[in-house]
A protein has these predicted regions:
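Extracellular, beta-strand-rich glycan-interacting domains
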Residues: 469-471
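C-terminal alpha-helical interaction module
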Residues: 513-514
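N-terminal secretory signal peptides that target proteins for export/translocation
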Residues: 1-4
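Formylglycine-dependent sulfatase
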Residues: 6-8, 15-464, 473-494, 501, ...
């Protein structure tokens, strides 16, 4: 037995999963599945991953799941942006295979996915909340999803009865209330009214904590008067100090959006809570600090509604006598910058956007209060769900089940590295690929749109970044070009090429990418 990355959380000692009494449900060979997915709910704000914001997180129910299940410490996104990440979760494939490269792409209904496989295995399936994949959901017996990415207040829900593809129009019907509450209401109702002769799988997808980070009135005064601690690199103005090779998206852009939404609401895409924002004119340091405080306050209030509604879902399982035989997963589609490097948003292969905070509970099989450090990615999720359901993974799935890892038995051949690729090209955030293992990270910013949708019509000079996460966990010093790491960098370059071949991401049809690779990707060099 290989038990690397597996440990007992001391805080969980003495805590047992809560279950209710007998019900009229039929005996089942395979467990029910409750898959809860949020948007941009980054690990820094969960409270179970440590960090400067951990003491401030409203996380009673996330902490309950952690105490009763297993926390993944190294779950990563393969393309840190909402639409591609969700497609990878469903299909078990990287973007170049499932065809969803950028925010503007759609998942084809005919594409195989885990919901279809669960149906074939005898499951009743439901999808509620944020879909964002533009075409009609396939593989679900019932769905009620937002138009596009949805709104926080009085969102439009679309069902099979009134479906319209996102690019054809809004369709659907407005439902009054706050979106996180409404999604939970619908999920609870579906669970209670389910076909009790079959196992179920419900995908409960929240919009929160996506920008504009709104919150229900019951959390409007949470954190009043609180001054949040700052990340050590909040005051990183530009790349000179760290040696990073791109501009990034600074917090000042968020303040500009707040001002635009307040002064010209009719022509801005969304609203934000608690405007106007009054910055500090003429003092860039004080201004950035003020922006950070508002962003984190809004964000944590928004996140509090997620935790609150996770509690409602867990209580429903208890009341229905389902807790013991239901796999409960809570995960975010990717992480998010909360002022680290002076940034907000995601996309970049830095730790904050790359990490997918993930907790899972299955009392029959997963030891309570454990943590697992194995490298897992979102392309593995579909295979895990298929494994629990006794189903086949989606066709051409590239991931593998980590069920045995969760029980403390990691296969000897389990991957030690993960491969990442962000396809959208922007001047401030160039397209890039990279590799990460348990200590090092290597990123190649190739800086070309390669015909991808949603990209700027620009080219960025190709560049490299390398980080030693053991000595520099916050990625404050780009060590590419440091002779002390030349051997490691060369080995990781070669391994990244091998992973590209393994995952069939070889850009064989792109003469432009071949030119970039031949000119700027020299596996034997750490200086190119």
């Amino acid at each position: 037995m290989d038990t690397r990355g597996f440990k007992i959380c001391a805080a969980a000692v003495g805590i047992l999963p809560v279950t209710a009494g007998c019900t009229d449900q039929a005996p089942q060979e395979h467990p029910n599945i409750l898959f809860i997915l949020s948007d941009d709910h980054t690990s820094q704000s969960w409270g179970i991953y440590g960090g400067i914001l951990a003491p401030y997180a409203a996380n009673d129910n996330i902490a309950r799941l952690a105490a009763e299940g297993c926390v993944l410490d190294n779950a990563f996104c393969t393309n840190s942006i909402s639409v591609p990440s969700r497609a990878a979760i469903l299909t078990g494939q990287y973007s170049h295979l499932n065809g969803v490269y950028t925010l503007d792409d759609a998942l084809r209904p005919e594409q195989d996915n885990i919901a279809k496989r669960l149906q074939q295995a005898g499951y009743r399936t439901a999808l509620i909340g944020k879909w964002h994949l533009k075409k009609e959901p396939a593989g679900f017996d019932y769905y009620s999803v937002f138009h596009d990415q949805g709104t926080y207040r009085d969102p439009v829900f679309k069902t099979a009865e009134n479906w319209m593809d996102d690019d054809k129009g809004v369709g659907g019907a407005v439902e009054k209330g706050f979106s996180t509450d409404l999604v939970t209401d619908k999920a609870i109702r579906w669970i209670k009214e389910r076909d009790r002769t079959k196992p179920f799988s419900v995908f409960c997808h929240f919009k929160a904590t996506h920008e504009p980070c709104d919150f229900p009135e019951r959390f409007a005064h949470l954190y009043d008067g609180v001054k949040f601690p700052e990340p050590e690199n909040l005051l990183e103005f530009g790349p000179a100090k760290s040696g990073r090779t791109f501009a990034g998206q600074p917090l000042e852009t968020m303040a500009w959006r707040w001002n635009k939404a307040y002064t010209d609401p009719e022509n801005w895409w969304t609203y934000y809570p608690e405007l106007p924002f009054c910055g500090v004119e003429g003092d860039s340091v004080a201004n950035r600090r003020a922006i950070y405080q508002k962003l984190v306050r809004d964000y944590l209030r928004c996140a509090a509604a997620i935790d609150d509604n996770i509690g409602r879902l867990l209580r429903t399982l208890d009341e229905e006598g389902l807790a013991e035989n239901t796999v409960v997963i809570y995960v975010s589609d990717q992480g998010y910058f909360l002022g680290e490097h002076g940034f907000f948003d995601k996309r970049i292969m830095y730790e904050e956007p790359l990490r997918m905070p993930f907790v899972i509970r299955y009392p029959k099989e997963i030891p309570a209060g454990t943590r697992n450090g194995d490298i897992v990615t979102n392309v593995d999720f579909a295979s895990l769900l298929a494994d629990y359901a006794g189903a086949e993974p989606p066709q051409q799935a590239q991931g593998r089940s980590f069920r045995s890892n969760l029980a403390g038995d990691t296969p000897q051949e389990w991957p030690r590295s993960m491969y990442y690729r962000y396809w959208t090209q922007h001047e401030i955030r160039p397209a890039h690929m990279g590799i990460r293992n348990d200590r090092y990270k290597l990123i190649f910013f190739y800086g070309d749109r390669l015909g991808m949708t949603g990209s700027d019509d620009c080219v960025s000079p190709p560049s490299w970044e390398f980080y030693d996460l053991e000595t520099d966990p916050h990625e404050n010093r780009n060590q590419y070009g440091n002779p002390a790491y030349a051997e490691v960098i060369g080995a990781m370059k070669r391994e990244m090429l091998e992973l590209r071949r393994q995952y069939k991401d070889t850009d064989e049809g792109s003469a432009r990418m071949r030119e970039i690779m031949e000119t700027h990707y020299a596996p034997e060099s750490a200086k190119h």
